[in-house]
Design a protein with these regions (language model features):
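Active-site mouth loops of central-metabolism enzymes
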Residues: 10-30, 81-97, 116-119, 142-155, ...
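Conserved, mostly hydrophobic/aromatic
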Residues: 14, 35, 115, 171, ...
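Terminal or standalone catalytic/regulatory effector modules within metabolic enzymes
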Residues: 36-54, 285-291, 295, 299-466
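Active-site beta->alpha loop and helix N-cap motifs at the rims of alpha/beta catalytic domains
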Residues: 47-164, 171, 178-182
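Glycine-rich phosphate-binding active-site loops on the catalytic face of alpha/beta enzymes
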Residues: 115, 175, 221-238
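Catalytic cores of alpha/beta
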Residues: 154-159, 208-221
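Acidic, compositionally biased tether/linker regions
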Residues: 442-547, 632
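Structured functional modules or segments
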Residues: 517-632
Length: 632
């Protein structure tokens, strides 16, 4: 029996599960050379939510991150997680985009592609598999493990055979919710070894605490590889600690052969990063122990807590946890893994926060119910289906959802224009258009400012000298604060930094600037979330106020450049879409509750909103029966 090999998940799934994927590349770089010396089977370094959060929260280029990690780990394979037809996004992408993305990821440093589909629908894996085999990388087909009346050992084996037929080099049992038990693990690994005959890779989140025992039983049953994380990013929603597994298997025939001393040096580094970032340790609470009921994965748990905090509703976490399995059963028992974890979890949040189950439904949930994510594992509640689907077109179950996406690389390249300087930039835009456009615009502006400053400095006389570093600091302040323009006057000199699309700032106020300080400046304030108007007396009591059911961003149109869903004077029908509120990474259609006329659109496009912010006022056709704004 061969020794058990280990893959490190610290900088991908470990931080996604415990730190909401907020680890920066600066946190990683100093320790990567030591991690490269360990002798891991691979380091999981990319994919999952890391691509998204680089752009949304960390102001990092995910492609640059990958290249930097590769440069520091030349002796260790790098692995990434792909969501199949969703790649690292939350919707399906065309075959061409899948192929280009896989090829670019391999070119920039990825050696192992772990590919899963949230529904275990093999049709959503085909494009990834063919692209991986074409570029000569390692294709690890992953099975989304879950427990439900429709998920059986036979169904998992059938899917494993389909992955093998696509050319899988190894099979991952992906237990994202920590639902495996030691003896379930043993049975599954033995069955896969006997019937599939590929190396088995066990991925088991700690959550309820059984993962270390699962890994030991998997080794005894013949598993080849297991996932672990460095102790400061282990336990709780994450994975078992690598130090624990290495010590547990020492002097056995499964001995990993890894150096515990080196592993502890690495964990001491991560402990300092944890303290510096004020991140909590991974622990298993009573809520975690209830995983065998709610089945919420580690990464989903941390993001759910984060999103409830944004909604100012963290005190309702227990209610949401109780609602999740109910929603899951109603929509056919999808495994709770991205994107289904977000879709089901967000629906549970809406059901709890609004107090009216299924009154608000995200576009993504509607698409799933209509078949656009793939085939549901089990039957759905037909009353829910009828309520959600309405007049929407349901996809023929014999049609693979990916075939409907025909967007070409050339079309995307034309859309993003000169902002994209490489194939990777266009792919970034393909996956996250709004975030990529914002990121690329900002950084192209910075590059232009640097160029102009260099040109200016070469032509400036000594007596007219301007401190270029001071100006760069102003640019940084403008970028980070989101203001339109910063103007500073010092000793008769006037410096203005204006961001793209900004209006002119008010006249500058002279200030005294110490040489070592950041210049004080008069700035236009960043946008605040819209709030309810103080006085509704000017509006008839019969008008119905449509309010935001959640904290998020108001969008008046389905996409940039398209006409708004409705405008003042439009007739609307019951259940007609009025706008979108983006929250928790999902686009949530807000609909009219009744027939009427739009009398007021309260917000500009892309305005942040709080719970209860007025969005529209609608005059019902039967005004005497209408609900007034004070009771909406």
């Amino acid at each position: 029996m061969a020794k058990l090999q280990l893959m490190d998940t610290t900088i991908r799934d470990g931080q996604q599960s415990l730190w909401a994927t907020r680890m920066s590349i600066g946190d990683m770089l100093p320790i990567l050379p030591k991690m490269d010396r360990v002798g891991y089977w691979a380091i999981e370094a990319w994919g999952g939510a890391t691509f998204d959060t680089c752009l949304r929260f960390l102001d990092e280029n995910p492609w640059d991150r990958l290249r930097l990690i590769k440069s520091k780990t030349p002796n260790t394979r790098l692995s990434m997680l792909s969501r199949g037809q969703n790649l690292v996004g939350y919707k399906h992408y065309s075959r061409e985009i899948c192929f280009r993305f896989i090829e670019a990821a391999h070119r920039n440093g990825i050696d192992v592609f772990r590919v899963f589909d949230a529904l275990n629908d093999i049709r959503n894996v085909v494009d990834n598999a063919e692209a991986i085999k074409e570029c000569g990388a390692h294709f690890e087909g992953a099975i989304s493990y879950t427990v439900s009346p429709v998920h059986t050992l036979d169904s998992f084996l059938e899917y494993g055979q389909q992955l093998k037929d696509l050319g899988a080099d190894s099979i991952a049992i992906k237990d994202m919710a920590g639902m495996l038990t030691p003896y379930r693990t043993e049975r599954i690994v033995k069955a896969f070894n006997a019937e599939i005959g590929l190396p088995i890779h066990v991925h088991c989140h700690y959550v309820g605490g059984m993962a270390p025992a699962n890994i030991i039983k998997s080794a005894e049953a013949g598993a080849a590889i297991a996932d672990t994380a460095s102790a400061p990013l282990a336990f709780g929603n994450s994975h078992p600690a690598v130090e624990m597994i290495v010590a547990a298997l020492e002097e056995s025939r499964y001995d990993t052969g890894l150096d515990l001393g080196l592993l502890f040096e690495i964990s001491e580094y991560w402990e300092e990063v944890r303290k510096r970032g004020h991140y909590k340790r991974g622990v298993s609470s009573l809520t975690h122990m209830k995983v065998y009921s709610h089945q919420v994965p580690g990464g989903m748990m941390s993001n759910l807590v984060s999103q409830l905090e944004i909604q100012n509703a963290l005190d309702r976490l227990d209610e949401v946890m109780e609602e999740i399995p109910r929603v899951r059963a109603e929509v056919g028992y999808p495994p709770l893994v991205t994107p289904m974890s977000q879709i089901v979890g967000t629906q549970a949040v809406f059901n709890v926060l609004t107090g009216k189950r299924w009154s608000v439904v995200s576009k993504e949930m509607k698409d799933y119910i209509c078949g656009y994510y793939g085939k549901a594992p089990g039957p759905m509640d037909q009353e829910i289906v009828a309520k959600v689907v309405g007049d929407s077109q349901v996809l023929d179950p014999d049609v693979a959802p990916g075939l409907l996406v025909t967007t070409t690389f050339a079309e995307l390249e034309e859309e993003i224009g000169d902002l994209a300087k490489s194939e990777e930039d266009v792919l970034m835009y393909a996956l996250f258009p709004n975030e990529a456009r914002t990121y690329l615009s900002k950084h192209r502006t910075s590059e232009k400012v640097d160029f102009l400053l260099e040109e200016e400095s070469s032509q400036t006389k000594e007596e007219d000298y301007v401190d270029i570093n001071q100006i760069r600091e102003l640019v940084r302040v403008a970028e980070e604060s989101g203001v339109g323009e910063i103007v500073v006057e010092e000793e008769g000199a006037r410096i203005s930094v204006r961001m793209p699309g900004a209006m002119c700032a008010a006249p500058a106020v002279p200030v005294a600037v110490p040489a070592e300080a950041v210049p004080a400046a008069q700035v236009a304030p960043a946008a605040e979330p819209a709030a309810a108007p103080a006085d509704n007396a000017s509006r008839p009591a019969s008008w119905h106020c449509v309010t935001a059911p959640m904290v998020g961003t108001f969008y008046a149109a389905p996409a940039p450049g398209e006409p708004p869903f409705v405008k003042v004077g439009d007739e609307v029908t019951a259940n007609q879409t009025l706008c979108i509120v983006e929250a928790m990474k999902l686009m949530n259609e807000i609909t009219s509750e009744e027939m009427g006329v739009v009398r007021e659109v309260c917000l500009e496009d892309a305005t942040p909103v709080e719970f209860g912010t007025p969005l529209f006022y609608i005059e019902p056709h039967n005004s005497h029966d209408a609900i007034g704004p004070e009771s909406a």
